[in-house]
Amino acid sequence: MSRDLDSRFSFREVAAVNEWLMTKSKAIHAMRDNPAHRIGLLGASWGTDLTKDNGRGRWKKTWEKMFQDPETFADRSSKGPDQEILQEYVWRTWGKRSSVQHDSFFCEKFTGSIGFPTQRLIEKNNYVAAVWNDGEILKKKCPKPCRRYPDWIHC
């Protein structure tokens, strides 16, 4: 699992991870749970299982390509290079095809994504990868196609 150190695991996240772990063939788990989560693989909310879909072999090749590219780690002054690296070397090459994707807002953009297995509670830090001491409360309604159940307006 990859998480930012300033976020905490939630019941919602645990339920989504458990659902992914029950799949037999998808090496990557991607979670997008906020309107700001607009890219395929966020640096703060993904996981991998090396035993699924040749995950170990795919990651080995990914790391080899990354280390051969002098640009991969050249610019450390910008925010978010981890996400750019994940998009280029993992998501676009093999991660998208070998993933379970939980998505609350962009399920139509990310084909094959599914809604979260739990309904969002209206409380502080109520989305995956929330910064724990911000106390943000996400109240935005999610689009109907992203809802696991039609009556879950805060999915």
Kindly label every feature range from the protein language model.
Residues N34-C155:
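Catalytic core and acceptor-binding pocket of nucleotide-sugar-dependent glycosyltransferases
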Residues L5-S7, V90:
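Short, flexible loop/turn elements at secondary-structure junctions
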